[in-house]
Amino acid sequence: MPRIRTHHAGDLSRDDPRAGPLKSFLVHEIQSEDGSFEGISGPFGQWNRRLEPTATGINQIIDYRSQLPHWGWLVDLASRVALPRLLARNQASTWGPSDLLSHRQASLLCRCATLSLIAGFLGGLISNTLAFLAKDFGETAAAQANALAIIRIGTLVTMIGTALADRLGRRRMLLGSLYLASVAALVTAVAPSMQVVTIAQLVGRGSVAVSAFVIPIICVEEMPKRSRSFAIGVLALPAGLGVGMVLWFLPILDVSQGAWRAMFLVGFALILATRYAGKDLTETRRFVVADHLEPTHHHPKVHPGRFVAIGMTLLLLNVFAAPTQQLQNDYLLEERDFSASRVALFLLLTNTWGFIGVLGGSQIADRWSRKWAAGLGIAGLTLGNTLMFNATGWPMWVASTVGSVVGAMSISSIGALLPELFPTKRRGLANGTLQLLAVAGSVAGLYLVRDRIDTIGYGPTTRLIASFPLLALIPLCFLPETSGQSLEALNDEELPELGSTTVEDEDLGLDEPAIHPIDPTALN
């Protein structure tokens, strides 16, 4: 069991939070009969803290274990570094959640993080291999744009899947969508033509999009109200890692034109990984309660003003984001004469730092304003990506990095707004329908640039579409501020079995101990 030992010179003052049972954002304690402090609530599976007087002061000894699935080792490692400082200050971490997470919530977040990684890999396959795939089939940049536009029609799959999540449950549709996307990857691996690839990825990308909407819904429905953007930001990191893992394999595409097929065969492993990661994932309690209400119970409807405002934001943003992100590899290969290895290096070095924007944006969104975080991110994404397509040499690398870091600030804020703005039994359908507007923007953007790329080039074309995401800031201003508000209060929703219309973590019925008792023999 991990152990942290710190020394405090002299006695602890009465005002020092460590002198008694802690009640902080990290852990809630009670004092045991032997004088030590046992954790009763918090993200740790086991927690024991005791103070031992010495000749020169006080030794604080903490025995803990997160016991979290899949990522517990990382949490334990980070805790060893951060816990002594954070407990001494008794303040929330600059980069951590603003609320105390229960062990159940932390476990769910870890399971969703693994599923996000799988979804990220599946989603990144076609976008990062399309240029090589099209070259193997002898297709042009215009044909790639056409294929991407057709693949976007998979939003119909997304809308159906998210709507079913309101009826059949979040868990069932999340796992089912990842299974279907993995099968689509296997079909792509053996596809005889570009047309078959397009059809397979139409289904695959639509299924990945289902998971991309359902995972945030699960987390927003389970997390405390001041930590929802934090949770979305945390999930964005393994999703980005999944996309980055695709880049690890790009150098093998230099071996032969058909080497891209090997990357899609990973679908076999992802089916097994999905089964492993999802076996202990539970349904959200908000969905369970809402699903068991009497048929006569009134479920709030979607607020039309909110739907239009967030929908127009997504549409205008994607007119720019889809072409610049999807055709970036082709630009580097054709315009800058990069090899597959150099493309992978460029994307890794410029995109890896996006985690800074994700974490920073989530803190702004939770502690200040969702709309400010989203606005800053959209502006940074537009500026950075436009400059990247209009620069050469090191300025191109810097511009791409700026676009990745600042642009990532919008991920956790928009990702939280999408579930927050709609009631429980309408949340999936509303998000799936919004995907139609986002895809409409993507298709419009891809068709706008399709012919212009071959005639006027990438630089002038990106400057032409750069105004659209800036226009997206206008409808964003009309959205309500959701930071720090309960989902029930935001949507005028009553879930009687949860206790009130301002549901907090403790109101959701934690019917199991958040922290398990520590075996005293394990402390020796």
Where are these regions (language model features)?
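Structural signature of the two symmetry-related core transmembrane helices
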Residues: 172-186, 372-387
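Hydrophobic-ligand binding "helix-grip"
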Residues: 11-68, 77
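Central cavity-lining transmembrane alpha-helices of secondary-active solute carriers
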Residues: 148-163, 212, 348-360
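Extracytoplasmic gate region of multi-pass secondary transporters
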Residues: 126-131, 305-358
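Glycine-rich segments within core transmembrane alpha-helices of 12-TM secondary carriers
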Residues: 227-250, 254, 270, 435-445
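Symmetry-related core transmembrane helices of the 12-TM Major Facilitator Superfamily/SLC fold
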Residues: 260-276, 461-478
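Cytoplasmic helix-loop-helix junction between adjacent transmembrane helices
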Residues: 200-235
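Helix-breaking motifs and short loop linkers at transmembrane-helix boundaries and internal kinks
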Residues: 138, 169, 190-195, 224, ...
